[in-house]
């Protein structure tokens, strides 16, 4: 299973494809297929059939997943897409020293 720099809840921008330039929050990361579901991006219309429990059928709009290589993490300071780096910090928890990796914006150097 691959490790991704984009996590659920991140603000991302689509950098290629039919939704290029659109921004949204990551709702879900699908690691098996290397895809992400972004709020308000790549919206598709599906036909839903009415079922026996009384739910009405009709057209349902939902976000379809897009490949993770087509999105870039947005810098919280500038709002522009940025590359992601890591910095290690030592943090003291319960009297013990722990090393923690922190995601950092390559363009501004700020924590993400």
From Swiss-Prot:
Assigned keywords, A-Z: Ribonucleoprotein, Ribosomal protein, RNA-binding, rRNA-binding
A cellular component annotation (GO) from this entry: ribonucleoprotein complex
Keyword RNA-binding: yes
Region (Disordered): 92-112
Presence of the UniProt keyword Zinc-finger in the record: no
Species the sequence originates in: Kocuria rhizophila (strain ATCC 9341 / DSM 348 / NBRC 103217 / DC2201)
Family: Belongs to the universal ribosomal protein uL24 family.
The encoding gene: rplX
Protein purpose: One of two assembly initiator proteins, it binds directly to the 5'-end of the 23S rRNA, where it nucleates assembly of the 50S subunit.
Origin organism lineage: Bacteria, Bacillati, Actinomycetota, Actinomycetes, Micrococcales
CDD domains xrefs: KOW_RPL26
Annotated GO biological process: translation
Subunit-level organization: Part of the 50S ribosomal subunit.
Pfam families assigned: KOW (PF00467), ribosomal_L24 (PF17136)
GO molecular function terms attached to this record: rRNA binding; structural constituent of ribosome
Designated name of the protein: Large ribosomal subunit protein uL24
